[in-house]
Amino acid sequence: CSAWRKLALFDAGKLGLNGRILFLDLDLVILSAIDELFEGDAPFLMLENWYQPGNGQASLMRYDSDFAKPVLDEYLSDSETILKTYVTEQAFIAERLCVNGAYFDPSYCVSFKKHVMHSDWRRFTSKPYDKPEGAKVIVFHGRPNPPDAIKGDWGKSLPALKRWWKGLKPCPWIADYWRE
């Protein structure tokens, strides 16, 4: 799976990087200054999965350049076993690097689906919530992507009936922060 390619980020030397590294997926929306994401002593931080507390979410990770390389080396030495053991790369990364629940402050990084969309019948009748107070980043994990959310559409990859059933009203304020 292409998601496992994220592990290549842990070879900072090959990428010409050193020091503290912040990885952000391309489908994130930055709402305000992200300086706080660099603060603290933890050598590795990632998001906590909003739907599976205690599990990591790899859309945003911060790590010290020399800290994560052993995880890439482990994967390269026994990828067959690791692929059979872990459903996703983020489960593998979280288990190996997220020491003592080293997650970002949950108020900084929020989920579009969980914190902006309505989770009940209101998704059919009401516009999504306004920008979450204090949030620095909105994560768009899966569908919709930011351009689709702005229009109120789940994207063409979903069948029309499913797009209707999932319901999504336009969220135009995201356009203030999103640039293609």
List the model feature ranges, each with a label:
Residues 66-180:
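A glycosyltransferase accessory/donor-loop signature
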Residues 1-3, 53, 109-115:
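A short acidic, often aromatic-flanked loop/helix-cap motif at beta-alpha or helix-coil junctions
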Residues 1, 51-54, 84, 129-131:
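Sterically constrained small-residue positions within well-ordered secondary structures
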Residues 2-56, 62-68:
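GT-A fold catalytic core of metal-dependent nucleotide-sugar glycosyltransferases
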